[in-house]
Amino acid sequence: MINKKISLGVLSILTAFSLQSVSYACTGFIIGKDLTKDGSLLXGRTEDLEPHHNKNFIVRLAKDNPAGEKWKDLSNGFEYPLPEHSYRYSAIPDVTPNKGVYDEAGFNECGVSMSATVSASANDAIQKIDPYVKNGLAESSMASVILPSVKTAREGVALIAKIVTEKGAAEGNIVTLADKDGIWYMEILSGHQYVAIKFPDDKYAVFPNTFYLGHVDFNDKENTIASEDVEKVAKKAKSYIEVDGKFHIAKSYNPPLNDANRSRSFSGIKSLDPDSKVTYKDSNYELLQSTDKTFSLEDAMKLQRNRFEGLDLKPLDQMALDGKGKPKSKKAVKGYAYPISNPNVMEAHIFQLKKDIPAELGGGVMWLSIGSPRNAPYLPYLGNISRTYEAYQEKSTQYNDKSWYWTVSHINDLVAAHPKPFGTKVIDEIKGLEKTWIAEQDKTTKEISDLVVSDPKAAQEKADKISLDRAEKTFKRLKAIEAKLVKEKPKNKKGLNRS
């Protein structure tokens, strides 16, 4: 068993980082199918909160619910009736359900995929008119209530809208839901206001923790779902803003753009399109971005691992500190910013959705990194799996050598603490594994897609076996990498190993 410790220096960096970024969590993205090299729709999110926060990956099986049974969120008191029958779905929950389940993302058996949420918050003027509701719908309940209940992405958006209208929202959030017909992007703006759009196939978007919707045609009922008073509330709050004579949602509902959202919006757009005209000084970044470039799954992975490569910025967690967790100089702070790939990332997921993949398989593949993908792999999972590897299910809140999350967390800590000796050795090997899996996945998906037509049970068993075998083999390799890093890490002046 490896004795896991974090050196004082690393702890100071992480502490300073956490204090400066306590309200910054998650970065989402969407790449429309017309902008991808293989015609797939790409969408995903990094889930950020804090270092050393265990995440599981599980499948919640289908079940019938007794009449009157309710979902109960122990973190804020929200309750909602369960459907008569709950569909099977995959989930990425926390391990402390009394503080919120946070199922976060997954496929359900009907082919609906969901990522929930990117947190955001309305400005003070809006909140005075339509405040958030303490026991309303929150991120902690979102996927757990929606995924087992809906057959289409639009149904999911409509159910969220119904709940927010009737019971209120506990917080501002951005949610994405997708199926074979495309992807919906939804902003829950205030206590009872929301706007959702069917995302265009020829656009891309990067969205950290602020609202992004500009002008939306509320009369386009086929592609828009919105609360009735979204404009009225902004006018009443006296925060209503028009651009080119039209109501601009983000400018009306947002507080001023903060540096962490600026840095991730800017670097995310530039990661995908270095020729984009956006600048670091922009006061607002529009949701719908255009480009003449096309993108691959690897580009999406690169986006979620972005640490300002090619830009005149350095990651905030690399600041020189004074020994007390504070920057040595304000001049240094000016050159540093908050990256998409930061120490607070707990997991990252990418949905790769294709028209020719049956809904029974989720309509695509979820590429999942439990733990930050900075030095950890994305593994592919189809939507029909019924089981996950045991290392994904360890519930410890501190280091556990049998846990996937804690193993990856330790590897990331070691590489971050010792960049000179370890360099890019780990991530280079990880990318090699991913390249192999990407090359193999189309063949695997085709075989299981063909099988599901004639024998759904056999298709599920095959998907389970392939994913379990891959996860087991990969976890053994991660344990070997971890052990090698521990053995090779530099020693301090007293000859003791530092972690």
Curated annotation (Swiss-Prot):
Task: State the EC number(s).
Answer: 3.4.13.19
Source species, domain of life: Bacteria
What is catalyzed by this enzyme? an L-aminoacyl-L-amino acid + H2O = 2 an L-alpha-amino acid
The UniProt entry annotates the active site at C26
> Keywords in UniProt for this one?
Dipeptidase, Hydrolase, Protease
Ranges annotated as spanning the membrane: none
Name any one GO molecular function.
cysteine-type exopeptidase activity
Q: Which GO terms describe its biological process?
A: proteolysis
Under the heading Pfam families, the entry gives: Peptidase_C69 (PF03577)
NCBIfam families per record: C69_fam_dipept
* Family, as annotated: Belongs to the peptidase C69 family.
Identification of the protein by name:
Probable dipeptidase B
Which organism encodes this protein?
Streptococcus pyogenes serotype M6 (strain ATCC BAA-946 / MGAS10394)
Q: What is the lineage of its organism?
A: Bacteria, Bacillati, Bacillota, Bacilli, Lactobacillales
